[in-house]
Design a protein with these regions (language model features):
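Flexible "cap/lid" subdomain of the alpha/beta-hydrolase fold that forms the substrate-access gate
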Residues: 2-156, 162, 174-181
Length: 182
């Protein structure tokens, strides 16, 4: 999203899988509903403790997301699961830094952009689970505030939708790329 806002002439189309705009994420995840994104709050903390905590139980930490966010246990065969977890454990610092940025510099930049009415000018496609029905928000409306040229499509899949529904995701990306700006 940031690349599309900062470099609109270089981004011909933007495809988003199962996330909300950063500013809206923090606005809608409040109270008990925030438990679905507890990891965001952990990784938003100052440098040091989150990294140590995650490293202490790295395989269990990353494995818990595979277990909770997939809707089909066959999505990640054992070898793929092991590779995903090992790669994530080896990238703890960068993963945490990326998440930490969503609660600091990314958030500040999004607030500034919203204040001046900056939007994504390219075609934007968002495909996601229907979190709004569970958590009480309209994801398409949240995205439309940032992207007037929006295609929004809910999908019956877990967070790892590209792995669970590859044909549907490929079709979505093909359709979106056909709308790319020249």
């Amino acid at each position: 999203v940031r690349a599309g806002l900062d470099h609109p002439d270089a981004v011909q189309f933007l495809g988003i899988l199962d996330v909300l705009p950063t500013l809206d994420t923090w606005d809608v995840l409040r109270g008990v509903d925030a438990k679905v994104a507890w990891h965001l709050y952990l990784m938003a903390q100052p440098v040091g403790l989150p990294e140590k905590m995650i490293r202490a139980v790295g395989p269990e930490f990353f494995g818990s997301f595979l277990d909770a966010w997939e809707t089909d246990a066959s999505t990640f065969p054992l070898e793929v699961r092991r590779h995903y977890i090992d790669s994530s454990v080896n990238a703890v610092d960068s993963i945490v830094a990326d998440y930490r940025a969503t609660a600091s510099i990314d958030l500040d930049m999004d607030r500034d952009d919203r204040e001046v009415g900056k939007q994504l000018t390219m075609p934007v496609g968002v495909i996601s689970q229907d979190w709004g029905s569970q958590l009480g928000f309209d994801a398409a409306s949240l995205w439309r505030a940032w992207a007037p040229d929006l295609t929004y499509e809910p999908i019956q899949a877990g967070h790892f939708m590209a792995e669970e529904k590859p044909a549907e995701i490929a079709r979505f990306i093909r359709d979106l790329s056909a709308r790319a700006r020249p």
